[in-house]
Amino acid sequence: MIPQVVTSETVAMISPNGMSLPQTDKPQPFHQWQDSLKKHLKAEIKVMAAIQIMCAVMVLSLGIILASVPSNLHFTSVFSVLLKSGYPFIGALFFIVSGILSIVTETKSTKILVDSSLTLNILSVSFAFMGIIIISVSLAGLHPASEQCLQSKELRPTEYHYYQFLDRNECFAAKSVLAGVFSLMLISTMLELGLAVLTAMLWWKQSHSNIPGNVMFLPHSSNNDSNMESKVLCNPSYEEQLVC
């Protein structure tokens, strides 16, 4: 191999076929594209991870509110399936951990962290799908529960019509509050689904954008230390470079 002089920072690619040094006086479109992709990923992942954490906190808070609601004969069965599934708690914790790990991975991108973030976001997509289905079923069950509540109030004898009117208002109020809680939880879950899909796609691009092989950066040396020699070992598939 002919010795080469490194006049600027050079990227040496070590592959099974040997080491190759690109020409320093020519632009490196692939590396420029890779750097641009990484900057784009960092900017987007930070924002999406922050929104993902906020939506998860919203789902968790609404789940705690539902769990603390006193038992009701007609409406408890509507959200009991949602609470028993554990989605407002387990799913929200999954989203929070996924968002935090995305921020950590954006700061320190290693293959293990990237693969872990990709896996967690794929699992978050599954949890979000499950949450959307359960919340939609709960929303659909509000109207029958409200009708049963109104019928029970009408059948109950009251001395004054005024008190019966107040009892009917309790049914409407319970339906309105639960509809608001379910709607907020559904919107947050749909946002989580979209963010998890986008983040998983970004991490997938990140994990597949690296070139196989080791990358070695050769810094610019002084004028006195500008000679480079190459030593080829007996194995032709291995090359070693020494900076003298």
From Swiss-Prot:
Q: Which UniProt keywords apply?
A: Membrane, Receptor, Transmembrane, Transmembrane helix
Q: In which tissues or organs does this protein occur? A: Expressed at high levels in thymus, spleen, and peripheral lymph nodes, with less abundant levels in non-lymphoid tissues.
**Which InterPro entries has this protein been placed in?**
CD20-like, MS4A
- Asked if Membrane is a keyword of the record, the answer is yes
In this UniProt entry, which residues form the Cytoplasmic topological domain(s)? Answer: 1-46, 106-121, 198-244
Its subcellular locations are:
Membrane
UniProt membrane topology term: Multi-pass membrane protein
Taken from the UniProt entry, a GO cellular component term is: membrane
Q: Which residues cross the membrane?
A: 47-67, 85-105, 122-142, 177-197
Indicate the family of this protein.
Belongs to the MS4A family.
Identify this protein by name: Membrane-spanning 4-domains subfamily A member 6B
Q: Which organism is it from?
A: Mus musculus
Lineage summary:
Eukaryota, Metazoa, Chordata, Craniata, Vertebrata
